[in-house]
């Protein structure tokens, strides 16, 4: 069992690595990210300076293993980076690439084309598909449901003092809430309140609808009687109260990419866990919370990502924001721990910035 590096001791571990150890460690990680296979001292000796013998390299590898940076998956096998080693590499050694002009144009053209006259969900779905195609991992987008544009609201009387508020979004989702009715309200007044709301909420998110109704408060008083006004306020209030509990929508594209080059039964089992995690809504809000905690792209390796921890996958994720700079969703790439982090980080970052600009 390999000892993992305690996060607080990483600076000390970094200081203890001389240039030769750093070079060997970097070559091991580079080889793993490229091929996914263990690398041995003999293979390393062929690509390192000729002054380093296999025996010298083995001694350095032993030190790296003692630090918890690498491990041997089998007896007499080469070495692979541990999860802690990958985190150490990402934090201390990784040099981020930059998107080419062609890649930027491709991302911008695809996202903007999908957003032109289309629903927000369609644009986010296309962004997920695009991230999958460019990363060879699975692209994912998490959108808070309360940010979907609204289409229609209707009040259906259940009892003299209760009604069902039915909210329909432009993507076809339907949500129901029971609201308390003001004493003495009639069916005609229910229709009045519904018609007034529909005239002002269509195409707006729930947050925007609340802001708009507050803005036209005087108009509301002039157009509606007291009981209908009360119902309008209660109808929006019940949705506002449930807003934080609305489930998030996870859009995933490119699952098939994760099946490429998978042969070991253990890897298949890990993928099974990952697919199960992506099918459940439980805990998806954690993903949004993780993205919200940072101002830009965040990288979660293996069990650092609690949502998909059983699958041993890595996640590169960034938040996107609305016109008020509020985090309203997250997007990214999930895949094996040997993701091409240096290329995927700027890709995710640029896509998140682009979608944020389109939501303003």
Swiss-Prot record:
<dbReference type="InterPro" id="IPR029016">
    <property type="entry name" value="GAF-like_dom_sf"/>
</dbReference>
<dbReference type="GO" id="GO:0045892">
    <property type="term" value="P:negative regulation of DNA-templated transcription"/>
</dbReference>
<dbReference type="InterPro" id="IPR036390">
    <property type="entry name" value="WH_DNA-bd_sf"/>
</dbReference>
<dbReference type="InterPro" id="IPR021153">
    <property type="entry name" value="HrcA_C"/>
</dbReference>
<protein>
    <recommendedName>
        <fullName>Heat-inducible transcription repressor HrcA</fullName>
    </recommendedName>
</protein>
<comment type="function">
    <text>Negative regulator of class I heat shock genes (grpE-dnaK-dnaJ and groELS operons). Prevents heat-shock induction of these operons.</text>
</comment>
<comment type="similarity">
    <text>Belongs to the HrcA family.</text>
</comment>
<dbReference type="InterPro" id="IPR036388">
    <property type="entry name" value="WH-like_DNA-bd_sf"/>
</dbReference>
<dbReference type="Pfam" id="PF01628">
    <property type="entry name" value="HrcA"/>
</dbReference>
<dbReference type="InterPro" id="IPR002571">
    <property type="entry name" value="HrcA"/>
</dbReference>
<keyword id="KW-0678">Repressor</keyword>
<keyword id="KW-0804">Transcription</keyword>
<dbReference type="InterPro" id="IPR023120">
    <property type="entry name" value="WHTH_transcript_rep_HrcA_IDD"/>
</dbReference>
<dbReference type="GO" id="GO:0003677">
    <property type="term" value="F:DNA binding"/>
</dbReference>
<keyword id="KW-0346">Stress response</keyword>
<keyword id="KW-0805">Transcription regulation</keyword>
